[in-house]
């Protein structure tokens, strides 16, 4: 759920293209846009009024899987070029697991997003 549908649709349309997701074309895409990659789909919808908080019951953050560390670095570069604030990274997070490499940032509603590579 998003507060400003047009703003979020534009943000996610650009972000999903940058990480290799494609638009999922379905009826009413203008009201319920979605993007997919492999077997994962991601959808947004206009929310009721109110402000998101990751410290309340519900969503803490969304993590997307990156195919490589280079892909994480490319997205971080894209985030900076598009003036999207990076919370932290890209860097190694050894406290998670060996080789965990990620960048964290926020969407227009303040929802924390992560793009991470975890070596096999």
Residue spans for each PLM region:
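Core segments of cupin and vicinal oxygen chelate
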Residues: 1-42
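Vicinal oxygen chelate
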Residues: 3-7, 63-108
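A short acidic/small-residue loop/turn micro-motif
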Residues: 94-95, 118-120
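Long, continuous compositionally biased terminal/linker segments
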Residues: 36-77
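Glycine-centered tight beta-turn/hairpin loop motif at sheet-sheet or coil-to-beta transitions
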Residues: 39, 108-110
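Short glycine-/small-residue motifs
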Residues: 113-115
């Amino acid at each position: 759920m998003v507060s400003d549908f047009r703003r979020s649709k534009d943000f996610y349309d650009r972000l999903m293209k940058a990480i290799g997701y494609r638009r999922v074309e379905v009826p009413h895409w203008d009201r319920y846009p979605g993007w997919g990659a492999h077997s994962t789909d991601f959808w947004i919808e206009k929310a009721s009024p109110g402000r998101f908080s990751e410290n309340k019951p519900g969503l803490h953050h969304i993590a997307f899987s990156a195919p490589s560390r280079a892909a994480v670095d490319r997205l971080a570069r894209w985030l900076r070029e598009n003036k999207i604030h990076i919370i932290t990274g890209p860097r190694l997070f050894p406290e998670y697991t060996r080789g965990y490499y990620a960048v964290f940032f926020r969407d227009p509603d303040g929802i924390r997003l992560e793009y991470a590579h975890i070596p096999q």
